[in-house]
């Protein structure tokens, strides 16, 4: 018998509302609609299939405040993460959304109607309170950045009626709903199930710790990786799922199953661990492995962890009775070469030789093509990871040149393009500032918002080209730190490599050598919003390379860039 769902009843809204499907579909076409973002889609899917039981919709203000302040819903049920539907001021100003009215929730990918929400209330969240109580308050936390920069001004709360499932085109057979997974466990005769959450590839150590956890509890294993939204920079879920599938035969026959979870993670540490436990309980698991720094976002700019290493374990243990799922504390295991086995570190006698490979070292080995030993990971898993992580010398990169107009950016960009073409090995694309303005951003002006949009477009193109293995050279003015950081994030999140080169040629030199007289026009007031004259240039705080045309030749600067790329391994050394 699978574990009872959180709150006692599995809120499978898709099954509940199926008899009214046609009626709801017709009504949905007559209602105003909210087109959901990717994160909202992930949340809606788990509301509709019961993964977020006992929720039946997006939280109203009463539930939102209670979850933030008390880690439970207004009715007293334990729940740790605000699940909210945010909308913009413009949507509110439109006047179509009011308490008591109904609104269609629509998929941005295919314009399908997914659900109808009956609005309970519309409220402006206290984002500072949410940031502090839910995520700890550090403004460098990715969830807090998302909250302040991406989440809209208002939340709409209310219960939903489900119309259609989300369409998925990848690994459909592995995307079990809670009800389907419970039926699967029952068919297999599983009564005790240890769930393992991961957003990373699994290696031999993970296999050992999950098998140990299952044996100690006479249980089976649910490998339940997140394939929704995870941490930027994580290995893509297509690669990870292939690796999980390759690993599965390494378990004793009949011990483990693989199921995928379309969750949008918040990287919320202790709060997220409680949330993950609730989700796994709803999927029928009786035990849940909580690791060291579970769902933590890593370190801030000062090198400090956002949470203590065992905060998540302590949080789940605190609510153990209410959760109704047994916490299995993640045991760090290490490899003993003399006996060819893995053991928990606290069980290894003093003086016994051990071996470990850190995540950083693994990434370096994948990047450089260095061998990865079989004691660490299985050959079939390594093969899959290598296919998705080609050697550095075959990867693409973006060189992003920033500086004043007439600082020498374009001359450097053109010379670098020629040099890289001569080098060979990858295609080279040039995105000059004026060219992009003419071809991609001709309708934009030079307000801060329009400048940011222009850089976003450059970054999107650069990210797509870089991901495909090209070398991209971009040379916009890009005067704002926020825009440059967003460009770096866009390229790296697309799977590319990004180098910011600050062309720090002094403004006086740029003006003095301006043969087109553009600075003179700006000084006379004929051009408004001109960088360096009546609009600021924010000096980059994290440039990978700083150069100056007033002190260096273009040739020497290009050579510096080439040396930087060579040092990073972007040219074949064989």
From Swiss-Prot:
Regulation: Allosterically inhibited by 3'-phosphoadenosine 5'-phosphosulfate (PAPS).
Region (N-terminal): 1-169
Site positions (Transition state stabilizer): 203, 206
Residues covered by region (Catalytic): 170-394
Signal peptide (UniProt feature, chain positions): none
Residue numbers binding 3'-phosphoadenylyl sulfate: 434-437, 451, 477-478, 516
Any one annotated GO CC term: cytoplasm
A UniProt-annotated Pfam family: PUA_2
Listed Gene3D superfamilies: HUPs (3.40.50.620), P-loop containing nucleotide triphosphate hydrolases (3.40.50.300), Sulfate adenylyltransferase (3.10.400.10)
Active site: 198-200
Site (Induces change in substrate recognition on ATP binding): 330
GO MF term list: adenylylsulfate kinase activity; ATP binding; sulfate adenylyltransferase (ATP) activity
Pathway(s) the chain acts in: Sulfur metabolism; hydrogen sulfide biosynthesis; sulfite from sulfate: step 1/3
Compartment(s): Cytoplasm
Chemical reaction(s) catalysed: sulfate + ATP + H(+) = adenosine 5'-phosphosulfate + diphosphate
EC number of the protein: 2.7.7.4
Example GO biological process: sulfate assimilation via adenylyl sulfate reduction
Residues binding ATP, per UniProt: 197-200, 291-294, 333
Binding site for sulfate: 197, 199, 295
Annotated segments matching region Allosteric regulation domain: 395-574
Keywords recorded for this protein, A-Z: Allosteric enzyme, Amino-acid biosynthesis, ATP-binding, Cysteine biosynthesis, Cytoplasm, Methionine biosynthesis, Nucleotide-binding, Nucleotidyltransferase, Transferase
Subunit: Homohexamer. Dimer of trimers.
NCBIfam families noted in UniProt: apsK (TIGR00455), PRK05537.1 (NF004040), sopT (TIGR00339)
Entry text on domains: The adenylyl-sulfate kinase (APS kinase) is non-functional. It is involved in allosteric regulation by PAPS. PAPS binding induces a large rotational rearrangement of domains lowering the substrate affinity of the enzyme.
Its biological purpose: Catalyzes the first intracellular reaction of sulfate assimilation, forming adenosine-5'-phosphosulfate (APS) from inorganic sulfate and ATP. Plays an important role in sulfate activation as a component of the biosynthesis pathway of sulfur-containing amino acids.
Annotated protein name in UniProt: Sulfate adenylyltransferase
Species of the source: Neosartorya fischeri (strain ATCC 1020 / DSM 3700 / CBS 544.65 / FGSC A1164 / JCM 1740 / NRRL 181 / WB 181) (Aspergillus fischerianus)
Protein's gene: met3
